Each structure stands twice: as C-alpha cells, then as structure tokens.
Regions:
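Charged, low-complexity intrinsically disordered terminal segments
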Residues: 1-380
Length: 380
C-alpha cells in the first residue's frame, strides 16, 4: 500500500484477489454503489457480483450499474431483472446507429460510498467475467486492479452520475458527452482522473499521455493491445534513441489479430533502440504506462480506438513511491516475458508475416476487437 495525497493506493495483481475486493467493497457499502463495466457476463463471477449488489440493495444501499451494450451483448437483459425489481438502476450504454455506433464505453470502475470523504473506488482493465478472476496459472487474464481509498474516490461521483444521466437520456447529443469528458478531467494534483472519448480534437487523457511521453526519458509500457498511431510510435522511438524505452505486449490472447497488429510496430521501434518483450505466462490484459515519475493506470489500451474513440478512464499518479512500486511490478513481468531480439525478428519478417501484421493493424484500428476476435489470421 502507498499513500498519495491522503489516499491509500492498493495494487491488486491476482485475479482471485480482485473478485474478493469487489465483493468486499460492495458488502461494506453504507450508502451507495456505482459500477461501470464494458463486459458484465452471466457466468459464475457475474452471478456472484450481481448477488452481492442485490444484497446491498436489500439493506438500503443505492445501487446503479452502467454496462456497455456491445461488450455485454452475450448477457441477456433478464439477468439483471432481480436487481431492477429490487430498485437498482441498470443501464446499457447503447449509442444510436450511425457514426456513434462505433463508440464503446470501455471504462471499468466500482465506486463505493463516493459521497463521503472515505469512499473507495476500484479501477483497472478487467471486466466482470470468470477469466478475469482466475489465477494466471489457471489460464486467467493477467491484469491489475487499483483500489483508491480516500477523497480522490469521491471526485469520480459527479462524472459517473453525469455519464449515467447522458446514457439514460433519449436523443442525447455527442457534444454533451464531449463536454462532460472535458469538464470532469483533472489537470493538477498528485492524483488526476482523466477521461477519453470521441472528442473533436484530442481527449484530456490522450493529451496528458502525449505530454508525459514527450518529456519522458525512461518509459515502460505494458499493453495487451498495442496499436498506437504513428505519432505515438515516433515518440516512443525517440525515447528509445535518447533514453530507455521498454514495451511488453501479449504473446497469448483470445484475439490473434491484436497480437499480429502489435508485431506490425516492432520493426520501427527496435530500429530506434526500444526493447520489445512478449508476455508468455498467460493471456495479457494489463494497461500500464510509466513515464519517468508518472504512472497512468486504468481501462485504456494503447491503441487508436482507446486514445481517440472509446470512453476510457485513467488515473495519472505523480508520486515517486508509487512509481517505484510500478517499476518493480514491471520488472517482475519481464521475468515472465520473452525479449524479441533483432536477429530472431529478422528471420520472422517474411513477406507473408508482414502482410498478416499490416492487415491486422489496419483491422484492429478500424474495427472493434469483438469483431476481429472472430477472424482467423493464423499464427506468427
């Protein structure tokens, strides 16, 4: 545990611990529980969380749940019928057809008692589904969760409530969504909540990331889905030339296209001295950026969709002790990763592989991962 600006930060690296934290937080809620997840499955873990929410409602706690309709499309609406009947608010984020159809609410949070100064929030990249709560050695997704206990948690309450109101409103306008993303993103302090979405220009979270990367000389990235725009790749390459840059991507996933898309970027980065690693132990789902003394942690992948389109929530932490903790975590992940050497990579850069990588990069930057997951791109 690290204390930052009066808030306790607790890192959760194991799947079973994250599920236990969720049920414990819901079980100890006194006034309110607010949840927001991209995927809320109807499996054992989903039922366990739903039943904990139902118990909270029955003891007088106000409960609201916002899930992405596309991400949770496999879970029928009647799964939440008991929650609604008990008085909870359950909303599916479902923008209308047209250009808004591509918009996904990719944020993940559990906010408990946000009205009080000692509220808590659990953030990270994981969803409510069995695979996110299994141990890594049992085939679970490798991810991180972070509990923030203290006044910073409550600062998320108005953002959540505004987004819920927008999602429930018929005919809600995109410009209203852009306004609330801008309004509630923070630009000062040791802990800053920053949000991303379909802005006309660059979102607050993407702008903050760009600034920190521009100034960075020691960069560490763990990105399960790594397909950033060329402007970001050039910035990472610059750090590789002038300082030190290390990137861990996935070697295993339920979506081969995302692995191949990341490999499309390797050549340019390695030519500039960036060290590339692929995580071997299990499927990787972590989203972590460390730029010198700043850490960005939350829901956002390091790709074009997350940077410029999806609704995302990240916490920027400017604290030397917490940064040291996350650098130690990064070093531990290197132990379960394989470095991609220049010599080995040159042997794999066949014409067919480069074609697969390029096609995959195009598709994952233009199409939702849930769609590309159904495509078969083969290995390498």
């Amino acid at each position: 545990m690290v204390t930052v600006d009066g808030n306790r930060l607790i890192l959760l690296t194991d799947g079973p611990d994250r599920l236990e934290a969720i049920t414990n937080l819901i079980g100890t809620a006194k006034t309110s529980v607010r949840l927001m997840y991209y995927i809320f499955a109807g499996d054992w873990s989903g039922r366990k969380v739903r039943d904990a929410l139902l118990a909270a409602v029955e003891r007088g706690v106000t409960v609201s749940l916002l899930i992405d309709d596309f991400g949770s499309s496999g879970n029928p609406d009647n799964f939440f019928a008991s929650l609604r009947a008990a008085g909870a608010t359950v909303c599916r984020f479902h923008p209308s057809w047209g250009r808004r159809y591509l918009l996904r609410n990719h944020q993940k949070l559990l906010l408990v008692d946000g009205e009080s100064a000692d509220g808590s929030v659990l953030i990270g990249g994981f969803n409510i589904e069995d695979d996110y709560f299994k141990a890594a050695d049992d085939g679970g997704w490798r991810d991180v969760g972070l509990i923030v206990a203290g006044p910073a948690a409550g600062r998320l309450l108005p953002y959540y409530d505004a987004l819920m109101a927008w999602s429930l409103k018929k005919g809600a306008r995109i410009r209203e969504l852009r306004a609330l993303i801008q309004r509630y993103s923070e630009t000062s302090g040791a802990l800053q909540w920053q949000f991303g979405g379909p802005m006309r220009r660059v979102s607050p979270w993407a702008l903050s990331t760009t600034r920190d990367l521009n100034q960075g000389c020691d960069v560490e990235v763990i990105a399960a889905y790594f397909a950033p725009p060329w402007s970001m790749l050039k910035r990472i390459a610059r750090v590789g030339t002038e300082g030190r840059a290390r990137v861990i991507t996935a070697a295993k996933s339920d979506n081969t296209a995302t692995i191949l898309a990341a490999r499309f970027t390797y050549n340019q980065l390695m030519k500039r001295g960036v060290e590339i690693y692929e995580y071997q132990r299990t499927k990787l789902h972590t989203k972590l950026l460390v730029f010198d003394d700043e850490v960005h942690i939350g829901s956002s992948n390091f790709d074009i969709r997350s940077l410029y389109l999806n609704l995302e929530m990240m916490l920027r932490v400017d604290d030397a002790e917490f940064t040291s903790l996350m650098r130690l975590y990064f070093e531990g992940e290197l132990d379960d990763s394989l470095q991609i050497t220049r010599e080995a990579w040159d042997k794999r850069r066949t014409f067919l592989n480069r074609l697969r990588w390029g096609l995959s990069f195009f598709l994952v930057t233009a199409v939702d991962y849930t769609v590309t997951r159904r495509l078969n791109f083969g290995g390498e």
